[in-house]
Amino acid sequence: MTETLLIATLAVPLAAALLVTAAPSARAADRVNVAAALLTAALALVLAVLAIADAPGASARGSWFVLDPAAGVFLALVAVVGLASALLSPTYLRHAGRGWIGARRSHVFYYAAFDVFWAVLLALPLVDNLALAWILVEGSTATSALLVAYSGKRAALEAGWKYLILTTLGLAIALFGIVVLFVAVGPGGGGLSRLDWSALNAAAPGLPRETTLIAFVLIIVGLATKVGWAPVHNWLPDAHSEAPPPISAMLSAALLPTVLLIAWRTELALGPGLSGGAVRQLFLGFGLLSLAIAIPFLWRPQPWKRLLAYSSLEHMGILALGIGFGTPLAIAGVVVHVAGHGIAKSLGFYTAIPLLRQNPGAARLPARGLARTSASTAIAAAVSLVALAGLPPSPLFVSEAMVLLGGMEAGLLVVAAVAAVLLALGFLGLAHALIEALLGGRRRAGSGVSPRSARAIGALAGVAAVALVAVAVAAYALPGSSLVEALMRGAA
């Protein structure tokens, strides 16, 4: 039953990508995609619950896929963010212009690319093989680059091209690392199955340490371009700024964390054959550098979506620190942070839909004066930025505390102290941005907010606020739980 559920979860969005091409009108394409999204999310969430609960027969490995608690956590995240993006896409598309081609065909193009992109993201947490994971990550690049450039404007085309080139170069580096690792594993039966997570974990202690380290560094540095870690994050602000808001939410709240999961699984699989210090230094270096580079941009006035993009750089850095610290408390913080960031960041990008609907110029200006122009949009912006800044009762406050305490628990007091200072500076930057967005009096980018779409975003903000508080409450039960123990075991 589990295998059938897994196949159905991936098959429905792929089937929807084909069905929308036969839709007779843009409205029909909307309906097909929404129906498929509801079914896809329902299947994925059932699968995720089975995996997280470690139900009998759920934690199993197939020929190419694995269903374990880690897969369940990230699968649930991708399902929820994908569903919300699918439901809000018709609202965006009705006033988005024609994109590259005519109105109906523009809808078809958007939905077909969206559904394939979502299917790839749903598959990534479930994949049980490093080589297949690389193929899926590259597939996510191709489909999402088309969506980044959807509007057809010069800035969007440049952002899509930049995203495609830089991430493909990074993935080429990762591919070289995979080849080095495959050669190090040596000849034998099984072909590419030798790159299964469990097979790598079993073989790692017997591999040449220097070769394994070189392969590991190449793979992680290559994947870092997709995760958005500094200094290989250059595509991130432009792509998030130019993509349609539902796609920006998918990129930041779903794509970045799922690729990070692949990097994490690689670390867990090869860990027995590596020096713990070398692995730790790589993740901690990416984490601190990402925080340090993000902070100045959070302090500067930024267009709304660009501000959220730099916030993603900061939060991916926090996740890198949690993995680098590697203690149970830090790993619990990583889980909470992934969930909280996914909810808050996607809400932030959805807030751009009413901002852009009647005022496309809002994409180029910092959002200001929302409290005077649209109460619903102001509430959504406030919920998003309060959560992202880590202000209690945000679950990100709890997760950041867990990560920092985990660093102290690991004996890395200096790293934890530096991270705490950087997080405090990031908090102040986002707090200033929030005040400007709500109460700022000049260049009010929210002056053209659409009442209908603003009400929808306001309702979504209420749901998101409840979900954020629920995650914060659940976070206190996470340290020492079987879920964290399963995540620590990883590929073992």
Model-derived features with residue positions:
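Hydrophobic alpha-helical transmembrane segments of integral membrane proteins
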Residues: T9-L10, V20, V227, H233, ...
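Cytoplasmic/organellar membrane-interface segments at the starts of transmembrane helices
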Residues: S193-W197, A243-P245, S374-S376, F427-A492
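Hydrophobic transmembrane alpha-helices and their helix-loop junctions in integral membrane proteins
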Residues: A84-R94, A119-A131, T143-A401, L405-E436
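Alpha-helical transmembrane segments
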Residues: L10, L14, V34-A44, A79, ...
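Transmembrane helix-loop-helix hairpins at membrane boundaries of multipass inner-membrane proteins
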Residues: T2-A112, S481-R489
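Alpha-helical transmembrane segments and their helix-start/interface "positive-inside/aromatic belt" motifs
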Residues: R27-A37, E158-G170, S374-A378, A454-V463
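C-terminal TM-helix exit segments that contain a strictly Trp-centered aromatic cap at the helix terminus
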Residues: L43-A51, L175-V183, L391, V471-A477
